[in-house]
């Protein structure tokens, strides 16, 4: 009735340890069923974009595929995955700065990388190449043609904005392809500052 067509939900991490690291205890409530919550929203003809972060201190190789699998299990219509990005003035920035983990802090030049879509720090268990590869594998997994088709057909079957779902999924897929090129350029231009 309100005209809401979609919601953006920050699930943040597929693991309880990741949620604890982020202080999202709310997501750890016993018997919380995210799939049921997503379905309840979708029953009102509202699309769900799920958001996750890659680069947490507990994240290890394989986190990208884990995020894609969990997002699929939750039944989200689209997925937005971002790098853990310490922004100046936050506790995360202060902590990572004190640990010597901020790699891009030559402002104002480096502001262009603070979009949540570029790795601007050293991650504890993932190298620069590793964290970028996790992002790529996550998006490649979630936005494969077969998975997009499955989601769009599901939305068509359930009469939930299949055209918007298709356009949204193809847009994310297209952006992902652009980011693959941007990551290659980024590593060439800035990679030495991550050593």
Task: Label each residue range with its predicted role.
Residues 1-78, 94-99:
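Conserved non-cysteine loop/helix-boundary elements of the Radical SAM core domain that shape
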Residues 78-79, 146:
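Secondary-structure boundary/capping signal
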Residues 81-83, 114:
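Residue-level detector of alpha-helical hydrophobic segments embedded in or interacting with membranes
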Residues 83-89:
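Glycine-rich beta-alpha loop elements in corrinoid/cobalamin-binding modules
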Residues 91-94, 104-195:
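Radical SAM enzyme core and accessory elements
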């Amino acid at each position: 009735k309100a005209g809401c067509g979609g919601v953006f939900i920050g699930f943040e991490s597929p693991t309880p340890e990741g949620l604890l690291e982020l202080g999202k205890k709310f997501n750890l409530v016993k018997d919380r069923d995210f799939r049921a919550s997503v379905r309840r929203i979708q029953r009102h003809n509202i699309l769900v974009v799920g958001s996750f972060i890659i680069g947490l201190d507990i994240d290890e190789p394989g986190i990208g595929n884990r995020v894609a699998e969990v997002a699929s299990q939750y039944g989200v219509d689209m997925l937005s995955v971002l790098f853990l990005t310490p922004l100046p003035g936050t506790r995360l920035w202060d902590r990572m700065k004190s640990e010597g983990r901020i790699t891009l802090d030559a402002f104002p030049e480096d502001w262009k990388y603070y979009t949540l879509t570029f790795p601007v720090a050293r991650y504890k268990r993932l190298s620069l190449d590793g964290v970028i590869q996790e992002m790529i594998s996550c998006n490649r997994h979630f936005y494969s043609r077969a998975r997009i088709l499955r989601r769009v057909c599901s939305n068509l079957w359930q009469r939930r904005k299949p055209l918007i779902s298709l356009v949204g999924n193809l847009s994310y897929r297209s952006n992902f392809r652009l980011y693959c090129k941007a990551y290659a350029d980024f590593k060439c231009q800035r990679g030495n500052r991550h050593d």
